[in-house]
């Protein structure tokens, strides 16, 4: 059994806390696990209005990878919109990434602008229910921010999670942004960087926000090296199918680490 260093990457409006069930399980198996708070997320003191792009939002991940000792490699695990953080990081530090796991996640490609998969998500799932939106200006650019609605959280993200998990999400989610208009003008992700890393895609057809239509489209659009389909669960597989995700990550470590 191989041991790996997993770096867990949360989605927008969330924080490292989303991994609280998976992290100790992986550590009990002997793995090293780092769960990061991205900019203006979790306990990071910045506010989203201070952040002007998905790249700036990814700064804690980039800083972490920069500081890794020479020769050390990690396995990135990104949930939901965390796939964009993976792509940004891989373009800068592909030599430090043994593999990347996309957990019910956006899967960017290298043939279209970085907003391409987000645009498709919005086409497939346009109604974010009671989510509230606002605009702010950073570096002369108008950015749309959002605060996830409690109905959306319960019905579409934490669909099968227990009441405690849902309460945690209501208490700890913060304002965030998809930076969709900024991503639309960002340079494409590169074949030499992001395109060169091993990609593992994990999904369930019971996801109520990343619908099967969207997930199957992503798999076809930018074929990953390996696909795992989890039976049951919801958008937050790390909470509803924790054991199954840990088993998949062990297999990833055995294969790619």
Curated annotation (Swiss-Prot):
One of the GO biological process terms: salicylic acid metabolic process
Lineage: Eukaryota, Viridiplantae, Streptophyta, Embryophyta, Tracheophyta
Annotated function: Involved in cyanogenesis, the release of HCN from cyanogenic glycosides in injured tissues; the release of toxic HCN is believed to play a central role in the defense mechanism of plants against herbivores and microbial attack. Decomposes a variety of cyanohydrins (alpha-hydroxynitriles) into HCN and the corresponding aldehydes or ketones; two natural substrates are 2-hydroxy-2-methylpropanenitrile (acetone cyanohydrin) and 2-hydroxy-2-methylbutanenitrile (2-butanone cyanohydrin), but in vitro can also act on mandelonitrile.
Residues the record lists as binding acetone: 11, 80
Enzyme Commission designation: 4.1.2.47
Effect caused by changing residue 207 to A: No expression due to instability
InterPro entries (alphabetical): AB_hydrolase_1, AB_hydrolase_fold, MES/HNL
GO molecular function, one term: aromatic (S)-hydroxynitrile lyase activity
Regulation of protein activity: Inhibited by hexafluoracetone and rhodanide (thiocyanate). Also inhibited by trichloroacetaldehyde via a covalent link on Ser-80. Susceptible to several serine, histidine and cysteine inhibitors: is strongly inhibited by diisopropyl fluorophosphate, diethyl pyrocarbonate, HgCl(2) and parachloromercuribenzoate (PCMB), to a lesser extent by iodoacetamide (IAAM) and iodoacetic acid (IAA), but barely by AgNO(3) and PbNO(3).
Quaternary assembly: Homodimer or homotetramer.
Record protein name field: (S)-hydroxynitrile lyase
Biotechnology: This enzyme can be used as a biocatalyst for stereoselective synthesis of a wide array of (S)-cyanohydrins by addition of HCN to aldehydes or ketones. Optically active cyanohydrins are interesting intermediates for the synthesis of alpha-hydroxy acids, alpha-hydroxy ketones, or beta-ethanolamines, all of which are important building blocks in organic synthesis.
Residues annotated for 2-hydroxy-2-methylpropanenitrile binding in this entry: 11, 80, 236
The AB hydrolase-1 domain, residue ranges: 5-241
Swiss-Prot/TrEMBL site (Increases basicity of active site His) positions: 207
Native source organism of the sequence: Hevea brasiliensis
Residues holding (S)-mandelonitrile: 11, 80
PANTHER family, per the entry: AB HYDROLASE-1 DOMAIN-CONTAINING PROTEIN, METHYLESTERASE FAMILY MEMBER
Leading EC class: lyase
Keywords: Lyase
Active site: 80, 235
pH-activity profile: Optimum pH is between 5.3 and 5.7.
């Amino acid at each position: 059994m191989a041991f790996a260093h997993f770096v867990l990457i949360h989605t927008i409006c969330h924080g490292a806390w989303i991994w609280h069930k998976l992290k100790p399980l992986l550590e009990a198996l002997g793995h090293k696990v780092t769960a990061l708070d991205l900019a203006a997320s979790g306990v990071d003191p910045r506010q989203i209005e201070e952040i002007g792009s998905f790249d700036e939002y990814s700064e804690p991940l980039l800083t972490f990878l920069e500081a890794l000792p020479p020769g050390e490699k990690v396995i990135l695990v990104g949930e939901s919109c965390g796939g964009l953080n993976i792509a940004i990081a891989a373009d800068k530090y592909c030599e430090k990434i043994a593999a990347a796991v996309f957990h019910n996640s956006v899967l960017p490609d290298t043939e279209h602008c970085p907003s391409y998969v987000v645009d498709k998500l919005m086409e497939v799932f346009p109604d974010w229910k009671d989510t509230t939106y606002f605009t702010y200006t950073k570096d002369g650019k108008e950015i749309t921010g959002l605060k996830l609605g409690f109905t959306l959280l319960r019905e579409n993200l934490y669909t099968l999670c227990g009441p405690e998990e849902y309460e945690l999400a209501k208490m700890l989610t913060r304002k965030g942004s998809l930076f969709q208009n900024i991503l639309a003008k960002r340079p494409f992700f590169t074949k030499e960087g992001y395109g060169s890393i091993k990609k593992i895609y994990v999904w369930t057809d019971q996801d109520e926000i990343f619908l099967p239509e969207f997930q199957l489209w992503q798999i076809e659009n930018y074929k990953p090296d390996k696909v795992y389909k989890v039976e049951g669960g919801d958008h937050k597989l790390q909470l509803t199918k924790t054991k199954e995700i840990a088993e998949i990550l062990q297999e990833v470590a055995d294969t790619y680490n």
